[in-house]
Amino acid sequence: MISGILASPGIAFGKALLLKEDEIVIDRKKISADKVDQEVERFLSGRAKASAQLEAIKTKAGETFGEEKEAIFEGHIMLLEDEELEQEIIALIKDKHMTADAAAHEVIEGQATALEELDDEYLKERAADVRDIGKRLLRNILGLAIIDLSAIQEEVILVAADLTPSETAQLNLQKVLGFITDAGGRTSHTSIMARSLELPAIVGTGSVTAQVKNGDYLILDAVNNQVYVNPTNDVIEQLRAVQEQVATEKAELAKLKDLPAITLDGHQVEVCANIGTVRDVEGAERNGAEGVGLYRTEFLFMDRDALPTEEEQFAAYKAVAEACGSQAVIVRTMDIGGDKELPYMNFPKEENPFLGWRAVRIAMDRKEILRDQVRAILRASAFGKLRIMFPMIISVEEVRALRKEIEIYKQELRDEGKAFDESIEIGVMVETPAAATIARHLAKEVDFFSIGTNDLTQYTLAVDRGNDMISHLYQPMSPSVLNLIKQVIDASHAEGKWTGMCGELAGDERATLLLLGMGLDEFSMSAISIPRIKKIIRNTNFEDAKVLAEQALAQPTTDELMTLVNKFIEEKTIC
């Protein structure tokens, strides 16, 4: 059996189609001066062909996925035709006498590598998008064939080293039953698109292309993260039964989509989605999100050569506000720094950037950045129910300073005659132990909290979650972290405020009952997790969850705490 990263759930049975393209061989020899213009023309001609292909793919993506996914390829075209990218490639051809393919490869690979070095998984996996564009450009420069996946004529399970977003957009969905790749991650655009299509997929297997041949009979079990190659009839029968069970469960979960997250004894909470762009709103709605608990705005600042203007930001926030209608959207101001550096901002070299110049620290030092973003959010609030949230807060002084700035920007907009929501709510992320321990004081200054468990866990336990040597110590359900979370929830309630959670823990099924019992008011997560979390909440009693939370928080170790939680789940047969 083969396993990897479960990208999109489901089970598929079918023959393997192994995708192999001609190898791209880069010509690295130096060219003579009289060949420079010829190589520049090769680059420009190859780019024109690649752009035309992407335009066709964009149109097909719009027809298949809707406008949200069409925008992915609009972004690909913009990057391919980026003036700075063009100048860098032409400069290498002219100044270093590189061939068109060598120059294009060096520039594209440099951008992809820079993204891969980030700690944020979503941003790291944008490297695959950049390489997708680069591969298409190189194949056109070199005159190599490009596989047309829309021409597949029989039912198959695709097996490939990797599938790019542009390849995924071309799939013949009547014939492609699922796919398996050597590379890739759960938050890559390819995985996101597979989930949009509800197409079973396992990525990141490492070596599936070396273990599978064309025509092999496969079972792609993207429920239990297993790939079976030429299985026995007994295994096929067993997995057919699992497939029926999955279909039944999926139908049951779908019935919960538009139902409230309310317990058997009448306690109601909100279940919302985390999004990065307006493209994600459609998936949130399809899975029954009751709003957006985290809109990550930093993606507006990435893959550019300058800060986005107020007008550019206003257009993006307005699009999300209008797409969400009457549902609330919590807009987090840019969380740049740490693992998310911007090349155009000249970040200082820091020994520990996660504890350095980042998030609101940048915003308060560079007031023009704060001004443009907050004004844009305020203006967009006239078109929907937006809330503003500031990350990486450690003190009351910071919150007061930020609120003072907001009042200045509100007055500017009044003077300019520009509409905004005068009563827009202001909140902060609680993701540092400093904020958690003064939560009672912070609650007097803001309208709501949202707990960021990823960083809160990392800072509380002094564990770098990206360090494989100590990653086992990264335990969001440790008693120390959970007791801090309880302290934050209680502090907000004491001041008549509410607390949400937008970290990974909010979508962790093992933690749902515990967080519910601790009094969490809002759960925000990846959209695909919403139906299952709603099911858990609707199948339990709030009073039982409170008893569980009280007992669990009294446990001295993570193991003892988890034993208690698992026993409760088994006895109540909730999940």
From Swiss-Prot:
Protein localization: Cytoplasm
Gene3D superfamilies: Phosphoenolpyruvate-binding domains (3.20.20.60), Phosphohistidine domain (3.50.30.10), PtsI, HPr-binding domain (1.10.274.10)
Root EC class: transferase
Binding site for phosphoenolpyruvate: R296, R332, N454, D455, R465
Catalytic activity, EC: 2.7.3.9
Single GO term (MF): metal ion binding
Cofactor(s) the protein requires to work: Mg(2+)
Gene Ontology terms: cellular component: cytoplasm
The keyword Electron transport is assigned to this record: no
Record field: catalytic activity: L-histidyl-[protein] + phosphoenolpyruvate = N(pros)-phospho-L-histidyl-[protein] + pyruvate
Primary residence: cytoplasm
GO biological process, one term: N-acetylglucosamine transport
Subunit-level organization: Homodimer.
Described purpose of this protein according to its UniProt entry: General (non sugar-specific) component of the phosphoenolpyruvate-dependent sugar phosphotransferase system (sugar PTS). This major carbohydrate active-transport system catalyzes the phosphorylation of incoming sugar substrates concomitantly with their translocation across the cell membrane. Enzyme I transfers the phosphoryl group from phosphoenolpyruvate (PEP) to the phosphoryl carrier protein (HPr).
Domain notes: The N-terminal domain contains the HPr binding site, the central domain the pyrophosphate/phosphate carrier histidine, and the C-terminal domain the pyruvate binding site.
Other comment: The reaction takes place in three steps, mediated by a phosphocarrier histidine residue located on the surface of the central domain. The two first partial reactions are catalyzed at an active site located on the N-terminal domain, and the third partial reaction is catalyzed at an active site located on the C-terminal domain. For catalytic turnover, the central domain swivels from the concave surface of the N-terminal domain to that of the C-terminal domain.
Family affiliation: Belongs to the PEP-utilizing enzyme family.
Descriptive protein name: Phosphoenolpyruvate-protein phosphotransferase
Organism (species): Salmonella typhimurium (strain LT2 / SGSC1412 / ATCC 700720)
